[in-house]
């Protein structure tokens, strides 16, 4: 039995949403155009009127996963203008990134599929991080001299610990895992000379 879950003109979005549901269950490698077509009530040929091939379909689903990551690290974290607020927002963004990886491991893995996205991410996790770093400098919580390249320092540290705790360290007790996450976040803070 198939059920149409899209409205005329919105098939591409319906397919990507169905793809995200499948990714959460089985991962990006389990994506099948035929299966997604059935889940939205169309033929496989209808899907490929919107996506050039399976690689394009996977790229769109990967991008949607990255955009979900961006939303997860954005909310509810309003931009801050004082040192303490900017530093706390930066820390919360790092924690939210790790929590996304822990809570949505297959979606997290799909987000970093090597592919050519159909358009720029919107929202973009990189832009969320960039804004947070700019706010740290504006508020005086981080020296301007530490700003160049700070995105890579922060991203690599948080992405690295996220990969470790979702794979090799998956069986580590929660308390020990939390301590490792905190050590990494503290290391980023020290490296970028963030105060307070």
Model-derived regions: residue spans:
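N-terminal intrinsically disordered/low-complexity leader segments
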Residues: 1-10, 21, 80-83, 195-196
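Amphipathic alpha-helical linker/stalk segments
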Residues: 3, 63-91, 120, 130-134
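Helix-turn-helix
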Residues: 14, 18, 22-56, 60
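Hydrophobic alpha-helical connector segments
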Residues: 74-107, 117, 126, 154
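Hydrophobic/aromatic-rich alpha-helical bundle segments in the mid-to-C-terminal region
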Residues: 108, 113, 119-126, 137-186, ...
């Amino acid at each position: 039995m198939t059920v149409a879950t899209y409205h005329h003109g919105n098939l591409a979005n319906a397919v990507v949403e169905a793809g995200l549901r499948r990714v959460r269950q089985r991962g990006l490698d389990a994506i099948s155009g035929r299966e997604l077509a059935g889940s939205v009530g169309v033929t496989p040929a209808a899907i490929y009127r919107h996506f050039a091939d399976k690689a394009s379909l996977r790229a769109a689903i990967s991008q949607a996963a990255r955009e979900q990551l961006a939303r997860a690290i954005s909310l509810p974290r309003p931009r801050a203008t004082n040192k303490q607020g900017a530093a706390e927002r930066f820390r919360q963004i790092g924690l939210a990134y790790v929590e996304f990886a822990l809570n949505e491991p297959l979606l997290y893995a799909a987000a970093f599929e090597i592919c050519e996205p159909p358009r720029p991410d919107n929202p973009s996790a990189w832009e969320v991080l960039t804004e947070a770093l700019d706010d740290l400098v504006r508020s005086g919580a981080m020296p301007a001299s530490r700003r160049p390249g700070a995105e890579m320092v922060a991203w690599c540290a948080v992405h690295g610990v996220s990969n470790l705790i979702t794979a090799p360290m998956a069986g580590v007790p929660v308390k020990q895992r939390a301590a490792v996450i905190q050590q990494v976040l503290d290391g980023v803070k020290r490296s970028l000379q963030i105060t307070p």
